[in-house]
Amino acid sequence: MNEKSLRILEFYKVKDELKKYTNTNAAKDLVDNLKPYDNIHDVREHLEETEEALKLIISRGNPPFDGVYDVRQGVKMAQKGSILMPAQIFRIGAILKASRRFEKYIKAKGEGEGFRIIEDICQGIVLLKGLEDKIFISIESEDEISDRASSLLYNIRKSIRDKNASVRDKVNSLIRNYSSYLQDNLYTIRGDRYVLPVRAENKALVPGLVHDQSSSGSTLYIEPMALVNLNNEIKELKLKEKAEIDRILYELSKEIHDNIVVIKNNADIIWELDFIFAKAKFGSELNGNIPIVNDNCIIDIVEGRHPLIDRKTVVPMDVYMGKDFTCLVITGPNTGGKTVALKTMGLLHIMALSGLMIPARENSTVGFFTEIFADIGDEQSIEQNLSTFSSHMTNIINIINNSDEKSLILFDELGAGTDPTEGAALAVSILENLKDRGSMIVATTHYSELKAYALKSNGVENASVEFDVDTLKPTYKLMIGIPGKSNAFEISKRLGLPEFIIKAARENIASEALKFEDLIQSLQEKRIKAENYFREAEILKREAAKIKEKYEQKAIRLQEVRDKSITEAHRKAREIIRESKEEADRILKDIRELEKMGYSSSVKHELEERRKMLKDKLENVEENLYKAKSEDGQRLKSVKEGEEVFIPSLNQKVLVLSKPDNKGEVQVQAGIMKISVNLKELRAPKGSTKNTDKKLKREANLNLRSVATSVDLRGMDSIEAAYITDKYLDDAYVAGLKEVTIIHGKGTGILRSSITNMLKSHSHVKNYRIGEYGEGGTGVTIVELK
């Protein structure tokens, strides 16, 4: 892809932002080399690797890049067989450590997780744990060799510490002896040797070697003769220490050289991973998504935002083309909004084709273009001279000579810089030529001739950037299908141009042109209203979906509680049955004991009969426990819309809303809720025969439950209260209650109003009223049931 378009569309600024999320200079170099990939397979692969990195960050936290360095210089020296500096060895050890930790990071995946591309990259990591351990045992930091590097080094340093202690004892003794001759009662070190600060006039009184003097010459730094041998011994130990350190560095450098291929490979992998995860972090910061890339050059970007404009101020834009039209003409006043739309579209494509997430809604679609041409400049200047026109025409000629059906072409103020009539004619001809060869074109202009061209030409569509005449500013909302209006008269009027001048100007314009502009304004106003209605509908739709999801979850939880209660009741019933049987057996055993003791067998016979009757009755109850749920109504083979059926698991009648689908799922209305159940769970409603006595029907459905005469809704929201009330009224009706009390509290009256609205249409409610004095007043509603 041509470098000029990458520069004009500010892709380099995007890459500068991306670099902030890398850890190494090597990864920054990969960012510098980033540009759109040459084939769609590579684009999709690199987008997928970015998505995998984002999922890994979300599921496992940030990857282990701590302490990772750019070791290219050290690797290069090791390849030549050079002895490396401690810092270079330490950093290579950090790369080996990061490689090992990253392999562990990738392997620790959960069930069902898969990261194909990143796992494949990490397959190339070869662990060198032995060398890694040896490096970190030998080198504590970038400038310090550890005492543990070798036993010889440890012993040498111990000897140095001992000698230093001896020297300090000796020098402190000398300070006490020579204190009257010294500038200060302390020692210092010059060239690794202990010296005393002697006043110049006393140098003959302190025998020794002069190593230095102060800038004023008043102080001489003398090494007393008594310290010479001790200092010499320390110097010898220091030389031995250096020789041992050189040997250790040589051994480590040699081992690094022997494994340099593996080390370089591991380093390359870590830098590549650093680059990939930087893309994911950058995309996350943009609140971006992975776009869909298609080979048909279809564009459908939803709520796309320019990545370099502050998220708090940028206005999202929707743009689509490639199906019904391939040429989009954006018209309107010269306010900057059109250019932003143009740059946003081009830059988002470059980002997507470079494997980056784009700041747009999920499932936004971009086309795979092998070239993106951009002729964008500051064409909103008062001066439109020949040199400007020539410059743009040179760019346009280059575009015409190199574009094809895989090209996205962006023109800013096409045809500007020359006579408007000629410029408009040239613009139409250029667009027509590029459209015929299959290129995707987006052009901004303020020429009315191009609006007319877009209206009457196949494959060409008008668009405009919404402009607020009241504030004299663009809203930056792109409106496809509506041509832009120049708003010159309105803007001039707002800025204070006299009305008589504006009126005279209007008279100089043909009436057809004015009508055309007025029609455009009317279309814009209608479009804005329609979009507002659509947004409101979308908000309501999302809220309704949230409420539906909330109460479906509540229904599931209620059913779980209900099932658990039934199961627990069954368990307790079976426990009572078991204990009763055991008690009966114990009674029989006691009777036998009494019989052995001479008591009448008639007593035994009578009690045994009673025991048998108890056992039969208990067994019957136990059998009913297992049959109750499955035999609660006749199984249905089919249902129809509007039919009333019974769900045993809910112990509730429901209304069928749809026929069974291919999986046997039926949508039903249960109170205020719509739920899906399988046809197998539906039964014919109990007591459905017309001649069945109403009271008996209620008693049959009562199911031995005790229903309270009131329900307390205080503290609930309106929707939850309506659901609880609906269920309570069902239970109260089935239980045969004639009058119940709904406690909703006084508060703001919102809850009472919600309940009143529900009661108006409830099938079980005969009448209702606000509570009187002594009943709870306006804090309760008294309901009379049918």
Swiss-Prot record:
Q: What is its EC number?
A: 3.1.-.-, 3.6.4.-
Q: Which GO terms describe its molecular function?
A: ATP binding; ATP hydrolysis activity; ATP-dependent DNA damage sensor activity; endonuclease activity; mismatched DNA binding; ribosomal large subunit binding; rRNA binding
- Keyword Ribosomal protein listed? The answer is no
Which stretches are annotated as coiled coil? none
- The residues that hold ATP are G332, P333, N334, T335, G336, G337, K338, T339
CDD domains registered for this protein in UniProt: ABC_MutS2, ATP-synt_Fo_b
Q: Which domain of life is it from?
A: Bacteria
Quote the InterPro entries the UniProt record gives: DNA_mismatch_repair_MutS_C, DNA_mismatch_repair_MutS_core, DNA_mismatch_repair_MutS_sf, MSSS, MutS, MutS2, P-loop_NTPase, Smr_dom
**Smr domain mapped to chain residues:** 711-786
> What are the alphabetically sorted keywords of the record?
ATP-binding, DNA-binding, Endonuclease, Hydrolase, Nuclease, Nucleotide-binding, RNA-binding, rRNA-binding
Q: Which GO terms describe its biological process?
A: mismatch repair; negative regulation of DNA recombination; rescue of stalled ribosome
The record's family statement is:
Belongs to the DNA mismatch repair MutS family. MutS2 subfamily.
Quote the function comment for this protein: Endonuclease that is involved in the suppression of homologous recombination and thus may have a key role in the control of bacterial genetic diversity.
Q: What is the protein's quaternary organization?
A: Homodimer. Binds to stalled ribosomes, contacting rRNA.
The protein in question is named Endonuclease MutS2
Species of provenance: Clostridium kluyveri (strain ATCC 8527 / DSM 555 / NBRC 12016 / NCIMB 10680 / K1)
